[in-house]
């Protein structure tokens, strides 16, 4: 068998191919050699010469625990325990020379007696090293220029950080390493293949270089500092699942040996890399540096492990998906483990295992924000001072790009081994099961797998259960694609009743359909599967419900006229109070009129919405507007607020409710329009968790609808509803006294802004008729607006006037009739009032001008007040009366605002 000389990779041969490679190398002053092998290396007569020629300056390529060192050190026993603090800095933290200086400053500032610092490669370097391997395997000559880029990156960083002997020494080692890498990559280039050992060796160099540079920078501060090649100490055993398990016994022995030769108060250790028991270089795979730090922390029995990142700590949810996510002050080991498993950017679950054994707390800190205290992960503390001390749920996490596999059939019940057969088939294709849910009836089993693996899983199951499917024992193997998992995590869930109810209630109110549910008996998490498109909205909904953020509503305002504009101003003025005291965030993300609309995902600046509407508004498009308000996945709940009197807009309500958009409106057209449309909307409202509020349709800001509902819901029976429902007509007849003519009072009201631009819209009685129709329907009567008797106060000859001006000009000609009715009423000690009546006993309604005694509540009104009297079974002798302003922009907008807040409370805001 041909033998090729290279540099040492292992201290025993690794049999991976048909060509053994003998690799001599020089480390310090000692020459050793060993055997490694290339897989499927093409035999060539010149292979030895080709590879040997690449070796300019042989250097160490593997673990060297058995080698002598150049510099003798004072022998000493390794002191373990609380005197040690362990820090881990990721690639972003050591991404350039300035950041390495910042890291050194943190290390120097730590007043712990002894410090071990674990570092990753500089940012992107590990990816660059993998890219070198890929290029060499592909026989792409550009690996040489890419390697030069790696050299230059580290050379430039070293020049910026070091000087004198430290710089010369590091650059010499760097150049030697680059030459050896060049030889290794040349061998990979020739073979067209890199074994795992060769790959691990190549990619581990980034950590070697960053550790040496950081150690040199710390020494510039005059401190006793050395660096550790973790391959000399850390021993791991590869597993069948492409992971590694630490060998603590062997690692302890090697650490003791290493420390007797390298005792120092500060040790800078390489993360990510280690050795096998056979001294073959390996890595701890992705996220391995955190794992390295945890293992080292356990080996040194440190008092704390601090993992430095570029975030302030562990968040209650992904802040990219939930903008109001908060940094948690504490997490238990189990909570961190669960959140990591379900995709939270905390730690890899295996990182927690080594430190749990010795109760070593982990602190997640931000290297770019040293003032932030971070998150401590430790054993659960009964009196923990965390965010929301008694919060049963600490946080939420999601996993996307999953598919749900449902195996269903009556033949599964009571048959031993069915579940085993299912998951054996899944294992055979190498698929990873994320979540399992089984019905207690044993009729079905469903589980979630990554979407990229579901095709293989489906084929394996159909093959395994072909006979059972043909025989009817299994009814189907169903694949549900485009799914996501949402998990709620909290150790206190187990001792807190009602957590599940709150969780599922929040999802229901956000109109989220759940595909599958799983919860272990430990109750550390509740897991649900939802549609991928609903995932962010579901996350926001549950996050809000557990008080970890505000209850947030995406608000779309339709009709920014007098009422809508006043509402926007009220929301602007009250926004801060709502957020601070009630945890409600009303985010107006859209405003549309008949010609222009304005939209902003983060929320429109209400201090200048009028200006923005003019400058940035685009052409109005109701369908586009609707999709925008509904499609904002960052806000789980959306509401359309219709401030118009447009029948076309009202016809959209059913579709909005069907799409999960709540509706708030003062527009009377939907509830007083065609009866079938009204019944359809109310039926949908009752069957879904989508809300429809319309208090302002009858009494502006007065609680008319809510009072009526309260009476009915408590078992009272409506006999009669009678009232003055129009603020305009109330004002007219309250001031139609003495010798004043009716036309004079109408002109005065129009001038004061109490009437519509065309007063005939008020005098026709249609507005009152709509309110009577609404109240009749709320009372259970099936009345139609068209069949309601309405007394029109517009004289017939004037109903066809071409303009409001013409009408006002001719109105005095008809004053005599109403003046006569007033005189007759006064003679009888009565007054005229324009009222609407719902007669629930006779099942009819009327709108007419009636006379009331002067001591009647209706006769004692002033201004533009409304008054409504409810005569019921309970309030038969003395009606229940609601009285107050029933018109005006401020009170109407206030009524709409009240409905919006009522919706927020329904959705989980604290009351």
From Swiss-Prot:
Domain ACT: 407-482, 488-565
Boundaries of the annotated transit peptide in chain numbering: 1-82
Region (Homoserine dehydrogenase): 558-911
Pathway note: Amino-acid biosynthesis; L-lysine biosynthesis via DAP pathway; (S)-tetrahydrodipicolinate from L-aspartate: step 1/4; Amino-acid biosynthesis; L-methionine biosynthesis via de novo pathway; L-homoserine from L-aspartate: step 1/3; Amino-acid biosynthesis; L-methionine biosynthesis via de novo pathway; L-homoserine from L-aspartate: step 3/3; Amino-acid biosynthesis; L-threonine biosynthesis; L-threonine from L-aspartate: step 1/5
Gene Ontology biological-process annotations: lysine biosynthetic process via diaminopimelate; methionine biosynthetic process; threonine biosynthetic process
Modulation of this protein's activity: Inhibition of aspartate kinase activity by threonine and leucine and 3-fold activation by cysteine, isoleucine, valine, serine and alanine at 2.5 mM. Partial inhibition of homoserine dehydrogenase activity by threonine and cysteine (14% of activity remaining at saturation with either amino acid). No synergy between the effectors for both activation or inhibition.
Residue span of region Aspartokinase: 83-331
EC number(s) reported in the record: 2.7.2.4, 1.1.1.3
Binding-site residues for L-homoserine, renumbered to this chain: 756, 767
Binding residues for NADP(+): 563, 644, 668, 753, 756, 888
Name used for this protein in its record: Bifunctional aspartokinase/homoserine dehydrogenase 1, chloroplastic
Family, as annotated: In the N-terminal section; belongs to the aspartokinase family. In the C-terminal section; belongs to the homoserine dehydrogenase family.
Quaternary organization: Homo- or heterodimer.
Residues that, per the record, bind NADPH: 563, 644, 668, 888
Subcellular location: Plastid, Chloroplast
UniProt entry keywords in alphabetical sequence: Amino-acid biosynthesis, ATP-binding, Chloroplast, Kinase, Lysine biosynthesis, Metal-binding, Methionine biosynthesis, Multifunctional enzyme, NAD, NADP, Nucleotide-binding, Oxidoreductase, Plastid, Repeat, Sodium, Threonine biosynthesis, Transferase, Transit peptide
Function: Bifunctional aspartate kinase and homoserine dehydrogenase that catalyzes the first and the third steps toward the synthesis of lysine, methionine and threonine from aspartate.
Catalytic activity: L-homoserine + NADP(+) = L-aspartate 4-semialdehyde + NADPH + H(+); L-homoserine + NAD(+) = L-aspartate 4-semialdehyde + NADH + H(+); L-aspartate + ATP = 4-phospho-L-aspartate + ADP
Cofactor binding notes: A sodium ion is seen in the structure; a metal ion may subtly affect the relative position of the nucleotide-binding region to influence enzyme activity, and could increase the stability of the enzyme.
Annotated binding of NAD(+), by residue: 563, 644, 888
Catalytic residues (UniProt): 771 (proton donor)
Originating organism: Arabidopsis thaliana (Mouse-ear cress)
Binding of Na(+), residues: 695, 698, 700, 702
GO molecular function: aspartate kinase activity; ATP binding; homoserine dehydrogenase activity; metal ion binding; NAD+ binding; NADP binding
Protein's gene: AKHSDH1
